[in-house]
Amino acid sequence: PEGTWKIYTMHLSRNFGYHRSYINMMNAKSCKILLDAVYEPHYAHYKEMFGSTIAGFFSDEPETGNGHIYEIEDKFGTMVDFPWSSDLFGVLSEEIGEENFWKLPLLWENGADVDLTANLRYTYMDAVTRLIQKNFSEQVGSWCREHGVEYIGHLIEDDDHHSRLGSSLGHYFRGLRGQDMAGIDDIGGQVLPGQENVCYNNGTFQHRNGMFYHYVLGKLASSAAAIEPHKHGDSMCEIFGNYGWEEGVQLEKYLADHFMVRGVNHYVPHAFTAKEFPDPDCPPHFYAHGNNPQYRHFGELMKYMNRICELITDGAHEVHTAILYDGEADWTGDVERSGKAAQILYDRQADYDIIPQDVFAEREFYHTQIADGQLVVNTQHYNTLIVTEYHYITEAFAKAVKEMTAAGVKVYFIGAKPEGICDVTADVADMGADAWKEAARQANMQMAAELEQAEVISYEKLADLAAEKLADTVTLAPSNDRIRVTHYEYGDGSGMVYLVNEGDQTYEGTVTLAETVRKPAGKERTLTGYDAWLNQLYSVYTEEGSNAVKVSLEPRKSIIWILDADSQAENDTPEIESTQKAVGEDRLTETVQQRIHKYRGTPETLADGWMRSTCRSIDYPNFGAGKEVSLPDHLEEEEPLFSGFVRYEKKVRIENPANAILKITDAAEGVELFLNGKSLGIQIVPSYVYDLSDAAVQGENELVIEVATTLEREMSTIPNRYGMPKDDPK
């Protein structure tokens, strides 16, 4: 015909692209090769250890393998190769008919009919991700469980890539369906203090979406763990790796609290290395053959994490707001990713889960119910659903919106409602373009009717809703956008509230528990504080006649409150020490911070007369010659390349040992305090506050403070493995 035409040619290849030796994630026989070559030989050799010494197998960043590694600009409509398999051929032949494979160029073409393009891309991705789910994830997971072990791991989530092919698996929830935990990883500066809104793209390995890492990444894991019945609430994060030698226990504690308060309850610390020190691959290394000064301090952090993870396991996190997973929408057109909506909620202490549209299509699997003002998905009960701006949604979700709004569940679309249905089905013999377009028009009209009762709101309105209605665990006065909170409930009627300060300033104010948290079903619960670092309970004082608690929460520190319906009853909380010093009639002690707050005298400042000595970690505890110094000490100016232990010694007079407290306002980084030869423990986040009463004597006392640095300064002269320049040591 006359006019300008575009001619497409498509080619199938067995050996095209960058990853020609990869298994085909969509092909059952190809994935079976992995089991035959790796898993079966391990079982043959170690089967008596399976289920005991060997807990399971870990898939680290499995990928479809098309395109270049970690390419983030690989949406449909770009010139990349797309994966194919005989299984996929069969599925698409059933879905659209082999005679309609003429539509496949729409994977690349952006100038065609938008509805037809969205439908083809959704159909392709739905088939690809379902095959990956079945032939890779579920096949490997089933093998593991049949052999008495678990299957865990994570896919590439970086910068919202969890919904793409290439270096990921196309759909976060489907890609991990066969695993026993919902996994993620955080490496290389993805989550960093104060960088919630820092975003850039400078090429491979140099891109960052701070909003995704801080507000979506952790919640993907805890959400999948909660809504998928076979995961039993278990999530996992590979953590700490590749942050560089400058990462120490202070940053590691921030990262641990960051993910635990978001509900992640299992961790795989990355990375130990058997190579000779210094190994340039993905530092820091926690032991480093004895060269890392913070190894013992890291051990104390592991104890802290274990205690909190015990508290966020075998129950359910109480969340009443859900955000719709944006993965399917990313396949079909432009989409407002979830990060901004998530940030608006989380910065106002309104917690949320992220749920896929699959919960409406696979109701039996997810135990989905809609009734009495609630959307129930497995253990979770939501009264509000947030949908960012999508062009297309599935037919199952559109029907569910009508059902939810009729049942009293609030459904909010940000900015605009969707324009169409992405999985249109039509009873036309040849699925020709004209017939299909008419079917799409009818489906879109039906969708508009189903969404009629849902409300369109702005981000500004969402912020108001978050502050006024959706933040239903605690209220802060004054408000603060860096206090994070999670609410967890156990089967015995007890609960837990966990707060973390991710900001850089101490929060001074009042935290008021919601009435539904303190008194579920009208029955008041006892409120007890738990110091997870010291593993001690303490008294919590509420303002008379209210659920308000005055708090002072320093940066990178946490508060945990245990809510117990029967304070004498046994519960599933970890074994906790109660200190022996009761205050008045209380069965528990006050914290050292509470005692400082009550102190009305003038504290003594210990600035002068300190003897300082140093040693490398490998030489500890053989310190060198001492030098008299005053505090604050600026060792970094004298020895700019030193890393190791710094020891400060001083004799101090204590007249009232029973009330003696030492507060160290800052140190870099880990601190261990000795009084008269007795260690009073390791602390890793300032201010470092120690109760001296157990070791102090009236009169003269010998005080020793040992500070463990990072390895950053010692390693600053060694080039990194990428040949990139290093920043000046902090």
Indicate residue ranges for each PLM-predicted region.
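Short, well-structured beta-strand segments enriched in hydrophobic/aromatic residues
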Residues: 558-559, 698-715
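Short beta-strands within extracellular/lumenal beta-sheet-rich domains
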Residues: 642-653, 688-689
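Carbohydrate-binding surfaces of carbohydrate-active enzymes
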Residues: 46-56, 61-642, 653-657
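Aromatic-lined ligand-binding clefts that engage carbohydrates, nucleic acids, or primary amines
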Residues: 652-654, 658-676, 683, 703-707
